[in-house]
Curated annotation (Swiss-Prot):
Biased composition (Acidic residues): 307-316
Purpose: Ribosomal protein P0 is the functional equivalent of E.coli protein L10.
GO biological process, one term: cytoplasmic translation
InterPro entries hit by this protein: Ribosomal_protein_uL10 (IPR050323), Ribosomal_uL10 (IPR001790), Ribosomal_uL10-like_insert (IPR040637), Ribosomal_uL10-like_insert_sf (IPR043164), Ribosomal_uL10-like_sf (IPR043141), uL10_eukaryotes (IPR030670)
GO cellular component, one term: cytosolic large ribosomal subunit
MF-aspect GO terms: large ribosomal subunit rRNA binding; structural constituent of ribosome
Gene: LCP0
Assembly and binders: P0 forms a pentameric complex by interaction with dimers of P1 and P2.
Assigned protein family: Belongs to the universal ribosomal protein uL10 family.
Protein name: Large ribosomal subunit protein uL10
This protein's UniProt keywords: Phosphoprotein, Ribonucleoprotein, Ribosomal protein
Length: 322
C-alpha cells in the first residue's frame, strides 16, 4: 500500500497532467449522487473524458502551485484566479476533463439521471399531486388534511378532487409531505452529476451562462441588430437595413415639396402622385405631403391679414404726431 505522501504525489501528477492535456474542465455537483451513478458516469465518459474526485483543499493547492511555477503555461494563472474568485474548488464537486464538445459530456450525465423519492429537508422542484383515485383507504385521510388537499370517498377509496401543488422551488420537504408522496408512489426528484461551471479554452462559463438556450441568444442578437439599425436610421447612416426606409423618407419629402410648390416631377408618376396626395388618397406619405400643402397656402393669407393691421397702426401713430 503506497504511503500518504506517495498517493498525494501521484494524485498531483494526474491532476496536473489533466489540466495540461485537456482544454475544457467541467465543475460538477455531486450532491445526493450515489456511488453506482458515479461508476456509470465514469464508464460512459471512457474515451471522451476523465473524471477526478478528491479533497478540495488539496486540489486548490495543486492548482495554485501550478500557477506559481516558473514554467507555468499562459492559462495556469487565469485558471487559478477564476477558481479562487468563484470558489469553484469547494463543496461536494468533481472535475471532468475533456477535449470534446461539452454537449457530449452533458448528454452522458443526463443519461444517468436517477429518480428519487422526496426526503425530509431536501430542496425540491415544483411538485403537483394530480386529481383522481389514490388507492388509499379512508382511514388515511389525515395525510391529505395536513396538506389542505381536498378529497372525497369514492368506491371505498380516497379520491383527490382537484390537483394540488404541495411543493415549490426553494421549499424544504417536511415529514407530512414526504410521507404522503411516498404513499402515493410519487418520486419527484432527479439526482444526477450536475454541471455547475465550465472552463473552456481560457473562458469561464458560469451556471447562468450554461442555462442560456439558442432561442435566448437569437433573441438577444435580434434585439441588438434592431437597436443598431434604429441608431443608423436616426443618424442618417445608410446601411443594408436602413437604405430602404431612408429612400422612402426622401421620396416622401420630395412629394411634399411637389405638393407645396406646385412643381410636378416627371419621374415615377410624379403628377399622379401629387394629385393623389392633394386629394388625400395616399396612405402615410399622402397625409405627410398634404399637411405642408395645406400649410403653404395658409401662410400668405395670414400674412395678408396681418399687413393691414400693421398699416393701420402706423397710420394711427402718424396721425397722433400731427
Amino acid at each position: 500500500m503506497p504511503s500518504i505522501t506517495t498517493a498525494k504525489r501521484e494524485y498531483e501528477e494526474r491532476l496536473v497532467d489533466c489540466l495540461t492535456k485537456y482544454s475544457c474542465v467541467l465543475f460538477v455537483g455531486m450532491d445526493n449522487v450515489r456511488s453506482q451513478q458515479v461508476h456509470d458516469v465514469r464508464r460512459g465518459c471512457r474515451g471522451k473524458a476523465e473524471f477526478i474526485m478528491g479533497k478540495k483543499t488539496l486540489q486548490a493547492k495543486i492548482v495554485e502551485k501550478r500557477a506559481q511555477a516558473k514554467d507555468a503555461s499562459p492559462e495556469a494563472k487565469p485558471f487559478n484566479d477564476q477558481c479562487e474568485e468563484y470558489n469553484l474548488l469547494s463543496g461536494n464537486t468533481g472535475l471532468i476533463f475533456t477535449n470534446n464538445a461539452v454537449q457530449e459530456i452533458t448528454s452522458v450525465l443526463d443519461g444517468h439521471r436517477v429518480k428519487a423519492p422526496a426526503r425530509v429537508g431536501a430542496i425540491p422542484c415544483d411538485v403537483v399531486v394530480p386529481a383522481g383515485s389514490t388507492g388509499m383507504e379512508p382511514t388515511q385521510t389525515s395525510f391529505f388534511q395536513a396538506l389542505n388537499i381536498a378529497t372525497k370517498i369514492a368506491k371505498g377509496m380516497v379520491e383527490i378532487v382537484t390537483e394540488k401543488k404541495v411543493l415549490s422551488v426553494g421549499d424544504k420537504v417536511d415529514n407530512s409531505t414526504a410521507t404522503l408522496l411516498q404513499k402515493l408512489n410519487i418520486s419527484p426528484f432527479y439526482y444526477q452529476v450536475n454541471v455547475l461551471s465550465v472552463w473552456d479554452r481560457g473562458v469561464l462559463f458560469t451556471r447562468e451562462d450554461l442555462m442560456m438556450t439558442e432561442d435566448m441568444v437569437e433573441k438577444m442578437l435580434m434585439e441588438g441588430l434592431s437597436n443598431v439599425a434604429a441608431m443608423a436610421l436616426g443618424a442618417g447612416i445608410p446601411t443594408s437595413s436602413t437604405i430602404g426606409p431612408m429612400l422612402v423618407d426622401a421620396f416622401k419629402n420630395l412629394l411634399a415639396v411637389s405638393v407645396a410648390t406646385s412643381y410636378e416631377f416627371e419621374e415615377h408618376n410624379g403628377k399622379e402622385l401629387r394629385e393623389a396626395a392633394i386629394n388625400g388618397l395616399l396612405a402615410g406619405s399622402g397625409s405627410a405631403a398634404a399637411e405642408p400643402a395645406a400649410a403653404a397656402p395658409a401662410a400668405p393669407s395670414a400674412a395678408a391679414k396681418e399687413e393691414p393691421e400693421e398699416s393701420d397702426e402706423d397710420d394711427f401713430g402718424m396721425g397722433g404726431l400731427f
